[in-house]
C-alpha cells in the first residue's frame, strides 16, 4: 500500500477528518470544525440516530452494520471521495481489528505502525516504561497490597472490567 500515491490524488482544499463514532468522536469532529475541516463519522446503524443530532459538527455519515466494515471497498471509496484522513482514537483498533487498522488504504493521522503496540497491553506498558514515562505499579496475586488499587480483569475494555481494592481479598 502506497499512502503517498493516495494522498497525491487528494484535493488539499477539500480534506475531511473522519473518525469512528464513539465517546471520543464528538471531540475530534468539534476540533476539526474549529480548524476549518469538513468531517465524516463512521457509525453503527443502531447508533446513527444519536450522532445525527450533531449534524452541526458532522458533515457526512457512513452507516455500517459492523465496525469491521470500515475496510470494505465501498466504505474506503466513500472516504477517498471525501478526501478523508482518519483520526483514530482509543477504541479504533479494538473496533475494527488490527489487520484493518494497519492496512486500510486511507491516510491516518499518526502512525499506523503503533497500532500493534496499542492493541497489546504488555507491549504498550513496556514502550512507556522504556520511554521513561511513569507507569502504574503492577501487582501480582502474591503481592501484598498496602493501598487503594485499581484492578483490571483480563480482557477489560471500554471502562468495564475494573474495580477498586485495598487488599488481596
Model-derived regions: residue spans:
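Short N-terminal or domain-adjacent regulatory/targeting segments
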Residues: 1-14
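Short, contiguous strand/loop micro-motifs
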Residues: 14-16, 111-112
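Conserved hydrophobic helix-helix packing surfaces used for dimerization/oligomerization
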Residues: 15-18, 149
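Short hydrophobic segments within beta-strands
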Residues: 18-20, 42, 156
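N-terminal basic/disordered segments at the start of proteins
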Residues: 19-39
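Conserved N-proximal alpha/beta basic substrate-recognition cap immediately N-terminal to
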Residues: 44-149, 156-157, 167
Amino acid at each position: 500500500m502506497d499512502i503517498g500515491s493516495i494522498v497525491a490524488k487528494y484535493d488539499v482544499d477539500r480534506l475531511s477528518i473522519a473518525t469512528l463514532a464513539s465517546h471520543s468522536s464528538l471531540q475530534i469532529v468539534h476540533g476539526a470544525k474549529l480548524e476549518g475541516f469538513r468531517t465524516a463519522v463512521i457509525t453503527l446503524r443502531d447508533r446513527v440516530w444519536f450522532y445525527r443530532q450533531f449534524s452541526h459538527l458532522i458533515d457526512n455519515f457512513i452507516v455500517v452494520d459492523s465496525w469491521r466494515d470500515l475496510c470494505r471497498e465501498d466504505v474506503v471509496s466513500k472516504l477517498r471521495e471525501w478526501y478523508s484522513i482518519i483520526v483514530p482514537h482509543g477504541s479504533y483498533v479494538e473496533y475494527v481489528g488490527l489487520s484493518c487498522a494497519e492496512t486500510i488504504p486511507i491516510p491516518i493521522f499518526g502512525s499506523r505502525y503503533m497500532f500493534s503496540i496499542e492493541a497489546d497491553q504488555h507491549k504498550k506498558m513496556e514502550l512507556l516504561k522504556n520511554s521513561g514515562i511513569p507507569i502504574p505499579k503492577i501487582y501480582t496475586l502474591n503481592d501484598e497490597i498496602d493501598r487503594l488499587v485499581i484492578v483490571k480483569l483480563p480482557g477489560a475494555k471500554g471502562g468495564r472490567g475494573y474495580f477498586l481494592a485495598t487488599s488481596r481479598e
